[in-house]
Amino acid sequence: MKPSTICRKWLNSLPPTQGCLKKEQSIGRELLLEKGMPSHKDEAWRLCNFNRLNSFLSLPTICNSDDIKSELIFPEIDENSARIIIKPNENNVLNINLPNGIEHMSESELDDNLGTIVNSTNVKNDISVGLNQASSYELLALKVKCNFNKSLEIVIPSIKEKLISTRVFLLVEEGAKLDLLQVFLGNINSAQNHLIEIKLESKVDLSHGLISLGEEKGSSSICTLAVEQSEKSKYSLHSLHHGWDYARFEPRIIQTKGEASTIIKNLQVTKSKEQIATHSLIRFDGPNGKLDQLQKAVASEYSHCIFNGSIEVPQKAQKTQAAQLSRNLILSKRARIDAKPELE
């Protein structure tokens, strides 16, 4: 079956546009109808395993509460941490109990912010985002106040033989300091599609851990992370991807006025016939910005790791200090690692 046919069949299987993301759903579906799925001619997807990507769309998106993997056991939460577990079709995000210092964003705040960060990255034919927009029905939109003094965990488990789409927006207020941990858990023959937008106001210090663990047999994940940094903010991302049959991670960080610090430390580990790809974009829209990026990959057996790291430093971003390093370890003759740094 042709990719365009698979895409149309998937779009036709989706429920009607509805809820707070109705407008976003229409945008995503129109993009996919116009552009279709990517091909080897698209540079950003050139190395993609398209059989895996097409199977991503073969799973149904509608699930019942009985589908939820209820036997998951999580470590006991630390007294200085707050944990949110997102279970599609089981817990309405508006009814989640929030700790002191975190509140739901208002409707006007959402109107002003939702989608602006990911749109500002200016990615042409943004298929990853379009897939999420088309199929996300709930939005976890939180404002972190400067008086919040705990760590925050957001855990998203998969559902066997289902495709789930989640959307998260975090607005971190001026002067706040936050330790954030996100955990994505795969399941057999399952798929996840995540879109995360984070807006850091001035003088925010955010340490962001992202652990993405698949379950090998038919588990896949596409995750887009879009971060907007205001001046004098600090953002540190440490991520791990392991165990996915197919995974694609797209971190995009924009320093809107420069004068900010970004640290990225990513590790992806593959075995068997897995393919895990990281496509990062960091752009400086002002002077005196700093970046320290380290990408590590370990590939064994017949697996494939991909890294494409784009750094955009326009003329207005004077005195930018940007460092990017890629370190790779191949453990078998059949394994493959492709790394491509880009400075524009």
Can you describe what each PLM-predicted range is?
Residues 1-166, 173-175, 184, 330-344:
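N-terminal leader/transition segments
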Residues 112-344:
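Conserved beta-strand/loop scaffold segments within soluble protein domains that form the structured core
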